[in-house]
Amino acid sequence: MKFFVTGVGGQLGHDVMNELLKRGYEGVGSDMQEACDTAAPYMSLDITDRNAVEKAITDVNPDAVIHCAAWTAVDMAEDDENVAKVRAVNAGGTKNIADVCKKLNCKMTYISTDYVFDGQGTEPWKP
C-alpha cells in the first residue's frame, strides 16, 4: 500500500510517516518547507495551492492520503491578522486534498493532535 502524508515537518506527520516506513509501507511525505528531515521521499507542497495539490497527489498516485498538515499555533490562530491564513490552510487546504482524493478515488484520513471541531456549529470559529 502506498501513502501520501501531509505535514511531515510537524510532530504528528513525522511520526506517522516513520511508523508507516517501519511497517514496510511505501510513502511520500510533504510539508511547506523546501526540505525536511525524513527517511521517506519528500516534496515541498503548499496545500492552499489547489493546482499544486492536484499535481502532487496525482503524480504520487497513492492508495491513501494521511492529512496531518495544519496551522497548529492555536493561540496565534485567533489573532485577527492570522484568521485568513489559518482558514486557508486548515479549511481550504483540507478541502483541496479531499477534492483531489475524491477525484482520484483515493482514501483520505484526516488526523489532528489538537482542536478539532465537531462540525455542529452554525458559523466558522463558533463551533
Where are these regions (language model features)?
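Conserved internal alpha-helix in NAD(P)-dependent oxidoreductase domains
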Residues: 84, 88-95, 103
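Helix C-cap/helix->beta junction micro-motif
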Residues: 23, 60, 100-104
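Conserved Rossmann-fold NAD(P)-dependent oxidoreductase catalytic core, especially the SDR/UDP-sugar
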Residues: 95-127
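NAD(P)H-binding glycine-rich loop region in Rossmannoid oxidoreductase-like domains
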Residues: 47-89
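N-terminal Rossmann NAD(P)H-binding glycine-rich loop of SDR-like oxidoreductase domains
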Residues: 1-23
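Rossmann-fold cofactor-recognition segment
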Residues: 33-50
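SDR active-site strand-loop-helix element
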Residues: 6, 30, 65-69, 108-113
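Conserved glycine-rich Rossmann-like NAD(P)H-binding loop of the short-chain dehydrogenase/reductase
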Residues: 21-36
